[in-house]
């Protein structure tokens, strides 16, 4: 039986928007930890995580293939890199920003600075340290042509056992309704 359900342009069968990675200030050579893992629907360890070897923050910019969309819900799947990874490597905070201008297109090189672009803060997740989905439904939908995802800190203690990785697995953005 063929599924004849028609979806709005740019919306996936799970109801989330199609997105692509425009830019990231931290990514790794190992595909296990690539920033593109944020949008690949792989929720497993050993291949489905954005792992940033950073002690402070990691940023990436997603877009909607040049379109402006209304975003009402943001979901994050929390998982860490490989079998030996510990949940303390999860990002402790995730802040989401939006832009409706083409200013983020200035971000082209590793040396570019995310704060050279004007962003509007949309929400901040205080992450619960466990594997699985965590969502925020916004009070009002926001217009966005670009979405900035900022991972901040991790749950590790700041002593000799500190592990300098900030990780999460998947980001999904949803329209109203």
Language-model region placement:
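Local beta-strand/beta-hairpin segments that build beta-sheet-rich folds
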Residues: 108-124
């Amino acid at each position: 039986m063929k599924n004849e359900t028609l979806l709005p342009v740019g919306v996936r069968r799970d109801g989330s928007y199609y997105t692509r990675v425009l830019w990231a200030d931290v990514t790794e050579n190992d595909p296990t930890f690539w920033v593109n893992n944020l949008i690949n629907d792989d929720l497993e360890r050993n291949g489905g995580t954005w792992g940033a070897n950073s002690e402070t923050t990691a940023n990436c910019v997603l877009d909607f293939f040049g379109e402006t969309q209304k975003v009402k819900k943001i979901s994050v799947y929390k998982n860490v890199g490989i079998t030996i990874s510990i949940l303390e490597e999860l990002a402790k905070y995730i802040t989401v920003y939006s832009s409706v201008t083409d200013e983020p297109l200035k971000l082209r090189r590793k040396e570019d600075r995310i704060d050279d672009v004007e962003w509007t803060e949309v929400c901040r997740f205080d992450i619960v340290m466990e594997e699985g989905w965590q969502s925020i439904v916004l009070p009002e939908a926001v217009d966005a042509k670009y979405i900035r995802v900022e991972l901040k800190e991790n749950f590790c203690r700041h002593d000799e056992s500190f592990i300098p990785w900030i990780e999460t697995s998947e980001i999904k953005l949803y329209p109203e309704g």
